[in-house]
Amino acid sequence: MKQLLITISVFMLIGCISFDKAITTHQAVFDGNIAAIKEYLASGAEVDAKDEKFVGTFLHWASAGGQKEIVKLLIEKGADVNATDGDGDTALHLAGSTTASVEIAELLISKGANVNAMNMSPPGRRIGGMTPLDMATLGNRHEIAALLRKHGGKTAKELGVNYLTTDSILRKDGKTGEELKAEGN
């Protein structure tokens, strides 16, 4: 009886701790817990609900986590395949830059994901101005890059977008970072 009371007390204490339900549910999606997302959506939650830390939707988390079945479920429930996170990334950007499968990228594209969406990060965040193809190329995701090309995907440079590169950040007086380094600067 004493152990039962202790166990009940522990569960009551845990229940009093305030967890950010959105973050824990988004993490469950990333980890592939399809039961958690089904339960959350059944409770009336918005399919495109964003977490507060990364400002990503369930579709972002499922895509980044390589969770194909959850991606399918979310799309069936009306998830916006072109929703952006706090960095301006779509789920397709994340599919190209993480361990997501080619099948996830194909599914997103087949449901209308913009293959040339630009991520434009807010000031103070990482460098923006990349397409899903740029992300796939940087992530050495050759199969996804080929898929994006097949569907008309282009790099930001090919689209004529003046985006920041590491070299452009390092330029000083028209010189590249390598030129400045060679001069001792």
What are these regions (language model features)?
Residues 17-19:
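Bacterial signal peptide processing site
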Residues 33-41, 67-75, 100-109, 141-149, ...:
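Ankyrin repeat structural motif
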Residues 4-13:
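Sec-dependent N-terminal signal peptides
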Residues 21, 54-55, 88, 122, ...:
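Start-of-repeat signature of ankyrin repeats
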Residues 27-32, 61-67, 94-101, 126-130, ...:
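Ankyrin repeat A-helix N-terminal signature
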Residues 51-52, 85, 119-121, 126, ...:
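Ankyrin repeat boundary/linker residues
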